[in-house]
C-alpha cells in the first residue's frame, strides 16, 4: 500500500516539475497570452479582473525603461537571477542590516505565473530554478512583455494597459515619463500605492526612477 502511494506521489511531483517547463515553452509563442495565479484565483472566485493584453511594441518605451530601472537594473545582463545582488542581500542579512529584495523581473514573472504571494523560503527557493529556466527558454523581450501584462497594479488591475487606463485614462503607449515612473514605483506594493494619488515619498522615488530611465540606454538594449 505504502509503495503504491509513494509511486503516485512521485508521479505527481514529476508532473508538477515538468508542467512549468512545458508552459514556458508554450508561453514563448508570441500569440499566447499567459495569466497569473492571482488572476486565476480572481476568476475562480468570480471577482472582477481588469486586464487588457498589449504587445510590448505598443507600450511606451519610457514605461519599460522605468520598470527596469526601478525593479531590476541588471535585467539585460543576468541570466534570470542576479547573483551579485543576491550576495549583497545575504551579506546585509548576515551583518544584521536592513532587509532588501533581490528578486529580478524574471523571478517576479515566474512567481506571478506559477507560485503564490507572501514571504516563504520554499517559494523563494522555487523561484531560482524557474527563473533560470525561463531565461533560457524566453527572450528578454518576451519576459518583459509577459511581466508587464500580468503584474498587479491594484486590486483586480492586471497589466500595464489596464493600469494606464485606470489611473491616467490613457493607453500604455501614451504614458508620460512622470506617469511611467509613478506606475513603476507602485509595483512593490500595489495594494497601498496609488500612482494617480502619489504620496510625497512616492513622488520622490519616482523622480529618481525617471532620471535613471532617461539615462538607461546601455542597460535596456535587450528589449529594443
From Swiss-Prot:
Its main location: membrane. The chain crosses the membrane at residues 12-32. It is found in: Cell inner membrane. HAMAP family: PGT_MtgA. Peptidoglycan polymerase that catalyzes glycan chain elongation from lipid-linked precursors. It is a single-pass membrane protein. The keyword Iron does not apply. It catalyses: [GlcNAc-(1->4)-Mur2Ac(oyl-L-Ala-gamma-D-Glu-L-Lys-D-Ala-D-Ala)](n)-di-trans,octa-cis-undecaprenyl diphosphate + beta-D-GlcNAc-(1->4)-Mur2Ac(oyl-L-Ala-gamma-D-Glu-L-Lys-D-Ala-D-Ala)-di-trans,octa-cis-undecaprenyl diphosphate = [GlcNAc-(1->4)-Mur2Ac(oyl-L-Ala-gamma-D-Glu-L-Lys-D-Ala-D-Ala)](n+1)-di-trans,octa-cis-undecaprenyl diphosphate + di-trans,octa-cis-undecaprenyl diphosphate + H(+). Its EC number is 2.4.99.28. The keyword Cell inner membrane applies. GO terms for cellular component: peptidoglycan-based cell wall; plasma membrane. Belongs to the glycosyltransferase 51 family. Keywords: Cell inner membrane, Cell membrane, Cell shape, Cell wall biogenesis/degradation, Glycosyltransferase, Membrane, Peptidoglycan synthesis, Transferase, Transmembrane, Transmembrane helix. This is Biosynthetic peptidoglycan transglycosylase. GO terms for molecular function: pentosyltransferase activity; peptidoglycan glycosyltransferase activity. Signal peptide: none annotated. One of its GO terms (biological process) is cell wall organization. Pathway: Cell wall biogenesis; peptidoglycan biosynthesis. It holds the Pfam family Transgly. It is an enzyme of class 2 (transferase).
Amino acid at each position: 500500500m505504502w509503495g503504491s502511494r509513494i509511486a503516485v506521489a512521485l508521479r505527481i511531483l514529476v508532473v508538477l516539475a515538468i508542467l512549468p517547463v512545458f508552459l514556458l515553452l508554450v508561453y514563448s509563442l508570441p500569440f499566447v497570452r499567459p495569466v497569473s495565479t492571482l488572476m486565476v484565483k480572481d476568476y475562480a472566485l468570480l471577482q472582477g479582473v481588469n486586464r487588457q493584453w498589449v504587445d510590448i511594441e505598443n507600450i511606451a518605451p519610457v514605461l519599460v525603461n522605468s520598470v527596469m530601472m526601478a525593479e531590476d537594473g541588471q535585467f539585460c545582463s543576468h541570466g534570470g537571477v542576479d547573483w551579485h545582488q543576491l550576495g549583497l542581500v545575504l551579506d546585509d542579512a548576515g551583518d544584521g542590516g536592513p532587509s532588501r529584495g533581490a528578486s529580478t523581473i524574471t523571478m517576479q514573472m515566474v512567481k506571478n505565473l506559477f507560485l503564490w504571494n507572501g514571504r516563504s523560503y520554499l517559494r523563494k527557493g522555487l523561484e531560482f530554478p524557474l527563473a533560470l529556466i525561463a531565461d533560457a527558454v524566453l527572450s528578454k523581450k518576451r519576459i518583459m512583455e509577459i511581466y508587464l501584462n500580468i503584474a498587479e497594479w491594484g486590486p483586480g488591475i492586471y497589466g500595464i494597459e489596464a493600469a494606464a487606463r485606470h489611473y491616467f485614462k490613457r493607453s500604455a503607449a501614451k504614458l508620460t515619463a512622470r506617469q511611467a515612473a509613478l506606475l513603476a514605483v507602485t509595483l512593490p506594493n500595489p495594494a497601498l500605492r496609488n500612482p494617480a494619488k502619489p504620496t510625497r515619498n512616492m513622488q520622490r522615488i519616482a523622480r529618481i526612477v525617471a532620471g535613471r530611465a532617461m539615462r538607461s540606454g546601455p542597460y535596456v538594449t535587450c528589449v529594443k
